[in-house]
């Protein structure tokens, strides 16, 4: 049989079989049930709760994840690309992200701006353009807000130090003010802001008039011999900043037009051990990490990541967390922690939880009432931790 004959025989058989099937009783197609069209929607959150925290994904993820420390659950994500800085609206309405990008990824026209995200649906509300910003991630105090949430301050260095002032109500850039030789910002109600300086002083930048005015305290630390960690903590109720040096000296400053800086004390001596020093080849307990301490203002407790090492081991992960009572200058508790955490935070609610994170992106949550681990979150993030401001 030729190929043409075989081909004709095959198609004839197939046609006959199809006709028999279609002609058989009950072979009609079953009616298709009507399907209701799916309605798309957007999940909505509650405004941020005091038990919530955000942890940056670092170089691994381009977002900060929102978790509830009380339940250990993931709430959502806020877009925070690499080398961005995050700030939370004190009223809980918005998340602000200070960002930089180029029109052609790593080249082209540079754009610096602050993105405004709604805290309930996490939708982008606006981008506020500004002249520039310092591209250093992992800092709590490069982008800060005024106590009323109406003004934003973004640190810049191009090449001189300066601050971009933003009107967050009108959502516009206002002006750039010079801040020579200083960095790490803290907002000062009724004045403007303060910053740590390379000469060991605390600068106060008055922004009330048309012209800014800078005053400086007397030097109180050595930026060369015993620097202060830039991720310091702030007690908004007392208008006080709490600082920590590489050797473990604790400083407090009451903020204002003329800040008052108290004499420092040794964190190690507060725990009953020898004070930290800059002497070489001396092993002792030292603070370290990227985000070295966390403050719970309502109780006056400071939590510090500590490790055994030598001076200048200030980036090492911790083996213990020390709880310091700022009123008595005493370490009231020492807690062993796993994972060599390099970041620490504490929620600002009445029943606070302690949060630690290490380079392996494992987050541990502790119930401070019992001191026990409440949750372990794998692959949750390893960057800076930001907690919801105290109500």
How would you describe each model-predicted region?
Residues 69-71, 119-121, 167-171, 207-210, ...:
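Short loop/turn segments that connect beta-strands within beta-propeller blades
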Residues 43-55, 98-111, 304-318:
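Short, conserved, GDST-rich strand-edge loop motifs in beta-rich repeat architectures
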Residues 285-326, 330, 334-350, 356:
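Loop/turn-rich, solvent-exposed surfaces of beta-rich toroidal or solenoidal domains
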Residues 58-61, 101-106, 159-160, 200-202, ...:
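Short glycine/acidic-enriched loop and turn motifs that connect beta-strands
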Residues 38-44, 80-91, 135-144, 179-190, ...:
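Repeated scaffold domains used in trafficking and secretory/extracellular systems
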Residues 123-136, 211-228, 257-285, 335-339, ...:
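Surface-exposed loop and turn segments in beta-propeller and other repeat-based domains
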């Amino acid at each position: 049989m030729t190929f043409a004959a075989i081909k004709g025989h095959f198609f004839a058989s197939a046609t006959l079989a199809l006709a028999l099937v279609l002609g058989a009783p009950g072979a009609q197609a079953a009616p298709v049930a009507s399907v209701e069209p799916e309605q798309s929607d957007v999940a909505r959150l509650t405004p941020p709760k005091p038990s919530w925290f955000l942890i940056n994904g670092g170089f691994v993820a381009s977002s900060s994840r929102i978790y509830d420390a009380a339940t250990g659950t993931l709430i959502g994500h806020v877009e925070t690309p690499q080398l961005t800085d995050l700030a939370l609206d004190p009223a809980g309405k918005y998340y602000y992200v200070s960002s930089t990008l180029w029109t052609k990824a790593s080249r082209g026209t540079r754009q610096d701006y602050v993105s405004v995200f709604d805290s309930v649906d996490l939708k982008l509300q606006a981008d506020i353009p500004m002249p520039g910003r310092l591209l250093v991630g992992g800092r709590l105090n490069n982008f800060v807000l005024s106590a009323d949430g109406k003004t934003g301050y973004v640190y810049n260095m191009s090449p001189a130090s300066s601050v971009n002032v933003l009107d967050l109500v009108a959502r516009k850039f206002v002006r750039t003010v010079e801040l020579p030789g200083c960095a790490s910002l803290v907002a000062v109600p009724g004045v403007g802001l303060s910053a740590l300086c390379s000469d060991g002083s605390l600068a106060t930048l008055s922004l009330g008039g048309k012209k800014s005015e800078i005053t400086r305290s007397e030097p109180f630390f050595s930026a060369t011999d015993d620097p202060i960690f830039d991720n310091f903590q702030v007690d908004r109720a007392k208008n006080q900043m709490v600082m920590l040096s590489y050797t473990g000296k604790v400083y407090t400053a009451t903020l204002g037009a003329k800040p008052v800086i108290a004499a420092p004390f040794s964190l190690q001596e507060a725990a009953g051990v020898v004070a930290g020093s800059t002497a070489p080849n001396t092993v002792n307990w030292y603070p370290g990490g990227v985000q070295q301490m966390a403050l719970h203002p309502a109780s006056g407790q400071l939590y510090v990541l500590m490790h055994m090492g030598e001076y200048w081991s200030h980036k090492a992960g911790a083996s213990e967390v020390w709880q310091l009572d700022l009123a008595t200058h005493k370490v009231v508790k020492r807690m062993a922690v796993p994972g060599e955490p390099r970041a620490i935070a504490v929620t600002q609610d009445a029943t606070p939880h302690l949060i630690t994170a290490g380079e392996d992106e494992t987050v541990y949550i502790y119930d401070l009432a019992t001191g026990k681990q409440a949750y372990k979150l794998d692959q949750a993030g390893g960057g800076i931790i930001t907690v919801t401001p105290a109500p």
